[in-house]
Amino acid sequence: MTILKTTILFVLAAVAEIGGAWLIWQAVREGKAWWWAGLGVVALGIYGFFAAFQPDAHFGRVLAAYGGVFIAGSLGWGMLMDGFRPDRWDVIGAAICIVGVGVIMFAPRPGG
């Protein structure tokens, strides 16, 4: 259950953070209405709550592991929303990061 909860929260956090940053990007760089940026700020705030709901009690561990999710998620978002096509090095790098997420979050530790 912990792996499932952690995974779901990381996915929700990625959608909120990457989506929020993308909305701000659209307003600032692509000429969309400024209310897009406002929605982006709200989404970024929501991201913080998803991170705080992680079952692991250590902020540094959660945010370090989330960094790997952010990297892979950003490439995926770019593919879906902007037509970005990652090259093999992008994919290899993202895969390495996801392995790192697993090690950081789920490696057996003394004391449980």
UniProtKB/Swiss-Prot annotation:
What keywords would UniProt list here? Cell membrane, Membrane, Transmembrane, Transmembrane helix
Q: Where are the transmembrane segments?
A: 8-28, 33-53, 62-82, 91-111
Q: How does it sit in the membrane?
A: Multi-pass membrane protein
Q: What is its main location?
A: membrane
UniProt xrefs under Pfam families: UPF0060 (PF02694)
Q: Which domain of life is it from?
A: Bacteria
Query: Could you tell me where this protein is found in the cell?
Result: Cell membrane
InterPro entries documented for this protein: UPF0060
> Which is a Gene Ontology cellular component entry for this protein?
plasma membrane
Q: Which family does it belong to?
A: Belongs to the UPF0060 family.
The protein's name: UPF0060 membrane protein AAur_4166
The taxonomic lineage of its organism, from the top, reads: Bacteria, Bacillati, Actinomycetota, Actinomycetes, Micrococcales
